[in-house]
């Protein structure tokens, strides 16, 4: 019997890197509302008392960068100087320029279908049937712990919680099936008023137990709640935050490969983002169709070229048909040119700020999570 452990982590919406991601995507959303053809690459840096928003943006829109950044920071919950970061009073610096005309000429075309990729690169998408949302379980539950932390913080259940937090879930597998939770790590920022004893009990009862399946918890499960003790100094006061530094948290928690490109702050002409969403969409529909228990898709692009330079399908021995047939089905049923996938997934809409915390995948409100191609794929495969 093969037995192994697998671990994934998540971070809260108040983690410094996630503050940066959310500001970048909030700027993108506001621009797309006015100018769907905008070219946006927005990067954010946050540290004690300041947020710097920079990057390259070409658009006919005008947006109030300072207002957007402050609104995001306050929405997250940083509204007091006692936390070391206050959206009302922090400095907001603007360092935005325009996208290179050399890139524009390679991307824009008279016929939108021939729109070139905004850059070269490799992108991966993944799906597995070990959860109902066809995502790896460890990252799914790590995200849910962070969502629960924010919920009990904001609704007043645990008013002494603060926005910065991290989670980590270690699952035990036997014969590739989950048999239990081996360990849970949850570190959360808190006010100075709460005792460690009260914090440990509250986190266990209000965050961990409501989220993790009871059947996976046992006397052998290990819990590490704020294992260093005090966590009063957090957020940008404790660490600087940068857009694009949580790419594994954003995707599959290490259960699948990653091409290296971050998502937040990028408009959908950037295949780092849009093709990664399309690869998830393809992989999820293959698994939903019952053509494999696990599926990983790799796509690659050349700057200024519309057609992908490669498509790979890997089903890790779980495929019901040959991987080569799946590649042919992908080419036949999915338009993976930049404009094709933007149209297929309706990516021009201002939906991106919501993606910037708790993972881009496994959340059914996003269009790349639809399984509307599963039936046609199953029929085309002859199953």
From Swiss-Prot:
Chain spans, region Flexible loop: 99-109
Cofactor notes: Binds 2 divalent ions per subunit.
GO MF entries: ATP binding; magnesium ion binding; methionine adenosyltransferase activity
Gene3D superfamilies, sorted: 3.30.300.10
InterPro entries: ADOMET_SYNTHASE_CS, S-AdoMet_synt_C, S-AdoMet_synt_central, S-AdoMet_synt_N, S-AdoMet_synthetase, S-AdoMet_synthetase_sfam
Principal cellular location given in the protein's record: cytoplasm
Residues the entry annotates as binding K(+): 43
Positions contributing to L-methionine binding: 56, 99, 239, 270
Range of residues in the leader sequence: none
EC category: transferase
NCBIfam families reported in the protein's UniProt record: metK
Family: Belongs to the AdoMet synthase family.
Protein name in the entry: S-adenosylmethionine synthase
Organism: Mannheimia succiniciproducens (strain KCTC 0769BP / MBEL55E)
């Amino acid at each position: 019997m093969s037995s192994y452990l697998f671990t994934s982590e998540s971070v809260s919406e108040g983690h410094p890197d996630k503050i940066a991601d959310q500001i970048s995507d909030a700027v993108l959303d506001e621009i797309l509302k006015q100018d769907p053809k905008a070219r946006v690459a927005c990067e954010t840096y946050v540290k004690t008392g300041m947020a710097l928003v920079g990057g390259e943006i070409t658009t006919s829109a005008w947006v109030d960068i300072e207002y957007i950044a402050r609104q995001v920071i306050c929405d997250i919950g940083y509204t007091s100087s006692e936390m070391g970061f206050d959206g009302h009073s922090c400095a907001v610096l603007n360092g935005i320029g325009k996208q290179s005309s050399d890139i524009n000429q390679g991307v824009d075309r008279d016929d939108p279908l021939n729109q070139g990729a905004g850059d070269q690169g490799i992108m991966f998408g993944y799906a597995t049937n070990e959860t109902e949302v066809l995502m790896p379980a460890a990252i799914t539950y790590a995200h849910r712990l962070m969502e629960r932390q924010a919920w009990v913080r904001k609704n007043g259940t645990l008013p002494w919680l603060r926005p910065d937090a991290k989670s980590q879930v270690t699952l035990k597998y036997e014969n590739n099936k989950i048999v239990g939770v081996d360990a849970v790590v949850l570190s959360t920022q808190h006010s100075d008023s709460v005792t460690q004893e009260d914090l440990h009990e509250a986190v266990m009862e209000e965050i961990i137990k409501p989220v993790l399946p009871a059947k996976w918890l046992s006397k052998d499960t290990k819990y590490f709640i704020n294992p260093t003790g005090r966590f009063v100094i957090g957020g940008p006061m404790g660490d600087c935050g940068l857009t694009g530094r949580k790419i594994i948290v954003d995707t599959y928690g290490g259960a699948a490969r990653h091409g290296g490109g971050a998502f937040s702050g990028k408009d959908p002409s950037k295949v780092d983002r849009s093709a990664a969403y399309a690869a998830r969409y393809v992989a999820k529909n293959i698994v939903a169709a019952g053509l494999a228990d696990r599926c990983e898709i790799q796509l690659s692009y050349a700057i200024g070229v519309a057609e992908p330079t490669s498509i790979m399908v890997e089903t890790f021995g779980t495929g019901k048909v040959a991987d080569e047939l799946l590649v042919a089905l992908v080419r036949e049923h999915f338009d993976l040119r930049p404009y094709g996938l933007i149209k297929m997934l309706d990516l021009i809409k201002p939906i991106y700020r919501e993606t910037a915390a708790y993972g881009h995948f496994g959340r059914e409100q996003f269009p790349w999570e639809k399984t509307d191609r599963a039936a046609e794929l199953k029929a085309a495969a002859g199953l």
